[in-house]
Amino acid sequence: MTITAGMKCPSYGGEAVEAWGQQTMTVQGYVAGATPFFIPSNSVVNVTRSPNLITTIMVLDGITNNGNGTLTQRVWSSDGWGKDKTFPGTVWQILPAGQSGNRGLLIEDSTDFIAITDVSRVASCVFSGTVNVNGTYALPAKGLVFARWNDSAATLECDGNNIYSRQDYTGYDDIARSVNVDIAIFAVQAPVPGRGLNFINAAGQCTFSTTRRPFIFRNQFFSPGNSWVDIGNSMIALGSYGFNSSVASGWCNMRSKGLVMSGNSVKGGNGRVRSRWTDRYSVTGERYTGMSIPIIPAMY
């Protein structure tokens, strides 16, 4: 176990359920000064609205932090429809650094674990290891999934229950790709005290224990796009981050966007085929979700 600067506490802020007519999400249990973020489990849909023959593609365009414990989803549509929509996913917040009264063990730029009053939303690392993803991998626990892999042709996505691997491709076929992936899953389970270092709050609840690996966060984020970005020896949060729609074999094939990693570099990539329709009414193009994805050191 390594004790280092940047030990933060991720806190579960609730689940966004897919819905129409609304775009604002509440960060449940919001703490002032925390860093909220959203991990979408799906970021694209297509809707055919009668009498239109050409489908409307809608994509999660970004997230606005309103600064008051709420987040607003921004939605883009291929024909300017402008319908409000909530895309599904999970809301999280990274509790701020602090040190109450300068007492106890000071770990630089770290959450004051003793000041956490309620552990019901605290997430800790419940699984870490290397797994093989060959098309679909069922997660051993549901939570916030960070990953690292080395394959410049493998796009990874996650819907909260499964990791999906696809060849980064724009043709007709939906091609699975086998890739070994290092993952770390943070789920809402309070730490269990044991041998080693434990932090106990005033209510007698364990808020940190070296029986589980800590969440190390150094304020690093990645915004998905087509260009490779060096993120160092790090892991990145998996989700769904946009769409690509292209014509092949007489069909318009709409894919969701995921992430591709090669060495220390990461970029966006084309993932699963989510829908297809005749190219007589094609809608082509691509768009990434303009959002910041958290990055953590690859120490798990």
Spans of features found by a protein language model:
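N-terminal accessory interaction module
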Residues: 62-69, 251-262, 266
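Carbohydrate-recognition beta-sandwich/jelly-roll modules
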Residues: 153, 257-258, 287
